[in-house]
């Protein structure tokens, strides 16, 4: 059985750093965290819902925009076993007037742990 829990799904408040997306996908023997949103909202929502974000088998990034990745700085990296992302996920992104990319400290944390 597969259980999918939406941890954060906010599309309207990008300017206020509240936008983003994150889901937790669990089966009997695998836990996948898909995207980590922008802020600590996934941590707050997981606490409210009594959802355990430890022992993540796979962290999957859909793409490298900060509204899907920046919440990583609130995640305990020792709880993540593997990261799956397209290599271009870590390259700078442009969208209109916003400069969207992994902030240097987030990218450093990922590369230090997994590369």
Enumerate the predicted regions with their spans.
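Conserved beta-strand hairpin/beta-sheet module of binuclear metal-dependent hydrolase folds
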Residues: 2-49
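Short, well-ordered coil/turn elements that cap or connect secondary structure elements
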Residues: 27, 77-78, 112
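Active-site metal-binding motif and surrounding structural segment of the metallo-beta-lactamase
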Residues: 41-89
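Short amphipathic alpha-helical segments and helix-helix/interface helices
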Residues: 22, 72-73, 108, 112
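Short, glycine/charged-enriched secondary-structure capping and boundary segments
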Residues: 19-21, 48-49, 74-76, 98-100
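Metallo-beta-lactamase
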Residues: 89-115
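Residue-level marker for well-ordered alpha-helical positions
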Residues: 19, 40, 69, 104-105
């Amino acid at each position: 059985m597969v259980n999918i829990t939406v941890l954060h799904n906010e599309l309207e408040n990008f300017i206020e750093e509240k936008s983003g997306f994150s889901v937790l996908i669990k089966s009997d023997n695998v836990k996948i965290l898909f995207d980590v949103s922008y802020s600590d909202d996934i941590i707050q929502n997981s606490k409210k819902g009594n959802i355990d974000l430890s022992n993540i088998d796979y962290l999957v990034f859909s793409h490298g925009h900060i509204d899907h990745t920046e919440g990583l700085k609130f995640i305990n990296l020792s709880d993540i076993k593997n990261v799956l992302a397209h290599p271009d996920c870590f390259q700078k992104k442009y969208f209109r007037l916003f400069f969207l990319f992994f902030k240097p400290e987030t990218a450093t944390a990922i590369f230090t742990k997994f590369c």
